[in-house]
A protein has these predicted regions:
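Generic detection of intrinsically disordered/low-complexity segments and helix-coil linkers/edges
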Residues: 85, 90, 110-111, 137, ...
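Non-catalytic architectural context of zinc metalloproteases
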Residues: 134-154, 158-171, 204-254
Length: 297
């Protein structure tokens, strides 16, 4: 799943990461000089951000070592044939300056580095999805959540992220691991939910995705919980495409019990809050919450 996220952030991320990894693993030259130290800082920033753009600002960051030095490192580990193409992406401030464009004047689809669209404009994408939507549908699917939009023979089309499609080999491995998890599921509902998630990955059917999420949100009694899929859409300038993520957690029973006590006494905290009594609410209700420990991310 990690490589899916890297590729979704920018189509150049994986080729650049592979070159950087080659240099870190194989370079036999001077590693103590200032230029190599600056290269190392760039590598760490790259790994932390899952690509060439800052994790929060989404602006591209740059190595502080000279371009010529970076090229010499690539040549030293046998990656010199990629230097011209990749170094232009790495060093040019004009190529993919933002992961998700916030331009108020340009086409934010064309200007964004994210790998959700290729060869299409915002107007074309909006028109494509508007033609699909039924205003009378009270339970619409999340149109375009798990696809890349491209143009083929002059026509706008979707390429699904599913087994047999884009990211197929990686998703096949994810399905295999999910099937192992289903075999040891804590509850029948959890097992059913995992089965629907696997079906969704294999078909790309967004109605199945909705069905999985309904089961997932209703499964509240287990100790183990997870997030897995193309879920959050804030990396897309149009707020439509979702980035893949995977996370497993375990309920902390002791901490959750303390949280329940706090929630049950919400009115006491409100009545004794250090604010002017005029601003205290006469009736408050605690929330339903649990405390978890992350296992994998």
């Amino acid at each position: 799943g990690r490589d899916i996220t890297w590729d979704q952030y920018c189509k150049w991320n994986l080729p650049i990461r592979h070159v950087v990894e080659d240099i870190l693993n194989e370079y036999e030259g001077d590693r103590e000089c200032a230029d190599f130290q600056n290269f190392t800082v760039y590598a760490k920033r790259l790994f932390f951000a899952n690509g060439i753009h800052h994790h929060y600002s989404e602006d591209k960051f740059f190595p502080e070592c000279p371009k010529e030095y970076f090229q010499s490192l690539m040549e030293a580990v046998g990656d010199g044939e990629q230097a011209t193409e990749l170094l232009e992406v790495i060093y040019s401030p004009d190529i993919y300056p933002q992961r998700r464009s916030t331009s108020k004047t340009g086409d934010i689809v064309e200007l964004s580095a994210v790998n959700f669209y290729d060869g299409v404009t915002r107007e074309e994408v909006d028109k494509y999805y508007n033609s699909m939507m039924d205003p009378n549908d009270k339970t619409p699917i999340s149109y375009g959540l798990n696809t890349k939009v491209v143009k083929e023979d002059g026509k706008v089309v979707e390429k699904p992220w599913k087994v047999g499609g884009i990211y197929g080999p990686a998703l096949e491995k994810i399905c295999a691991e999910l099937e192992k998890a289903a075999a040891v599921a804590e509850t029948d509902l959890q097992k059913e939910a995992i089965g629907k998630l696997v079906e969704y990955y294999r078909t790309g059917d967004l109605k199945t995705w909705d069905d999985f999420n309904i089961d997932w949100v209703q499964d509240t009694v287990g100790t183990i919980d997870f997030i897995n899929g193309f879920i959050e859409d804030y990396d897309d300038p149009l707020g439509r495409k979702a980035t893949w993520e995977g996370y497993v957690n375990m309920k902390d029973s002791a901490a959750s019990a303390r949280t329940e006590v706090l929630s049950a006494n919400a009115q006491w905290f409100e009545d004794n809050s250090p604010v002017d009594p005029r601003f205290r609410k006469p009736h408050v209700k605690g929330v339903s919450a649990k405390v978890v420990d992350g296992i994998t991310l």
